[in-house]
């Protein structure tokens, strides 16, 4: 049995805070290290090699500082590119988040699915799932969610985002003759717009994300491997650049219980 459980949560932005808050409800006694690659944010408009190098280098760097029992890559884009490599590299479990294609295919009634994600995640889905003959009957409508990701960060920092602004970004999907009855939220940031999406899309639209899968995996992997102690009040954030963006999100990080803020010196 372990006296202290160490969990690493990685994201380019603050979208991973959603998973942190959810996982902490079930595993409140762990020491959480949230790693924020704010210098590389957003990943959606970056090249694959750039993302792969940053994700792997940063996570390896963190594993040299701490002995993690679980590493969570709470970013669809990063998971699509680097998760397979990281799983082979570390002995301790590494889990990530990817669009739940199977569930969306199983529940769609009109065989039209919408995917909101970064271009890299969209390409991952197209190359790994929609080249199978069994999915030929499915029509996939995709939308680059980069602007929605930026807006979600503004919302998390307390800014009011008007519904029409979100609706305008979603027009390429909403203006289709047949609107998808199932929408995949292929980015952690989009979970913060769940209620706005419910208002914008037709009644009955199903929204699919991978939070339950990620939570279940986390609980299954570590729930029996440590001694429960008192809940740790203050957690730690590591960031990659002390820029204006980071200063803006500091109050939010503090609100989530991250008192200790430390810079990663892997990049100059």
UniProtKB/Swiss-Prot annotation:
Its EC number is 5.1.1.3. HAMAP family: Glu_racemase. Keywords: Cell shape, Cell wall biogenesis/degradation, Isomerase, Peptidoglycan synthesis. PANTHER family: GLUTAMATE RACEMASE. Pathway: Cell wall biogenesis; peptidoglycan biosynthesis. The active site is at residues 75, 187. It catalyses: L-glutamate = D-glutamate. InterPro entries: Asp/Glu_race, Asp/Glu_racemase_AS_1, Glu_race. Substrate binds at residues 11-12, 43-44, 76-77, 188-189. Provides the (R)-glutamate required for cell wall biosynthesis. Belongs to the aspartate/glutamate racemases family. It comes from the Bacteria. This is Glutamate racemase. GO terms for biological process: cell wall organization; peptidoglycan biosynthetic process; regulation of cell shape. One of its GO terms (molecular function) is glutamate racemase activity. The keyword NAD does not apply. It comes from Wigglesworthia glossinidia brevipalpis.
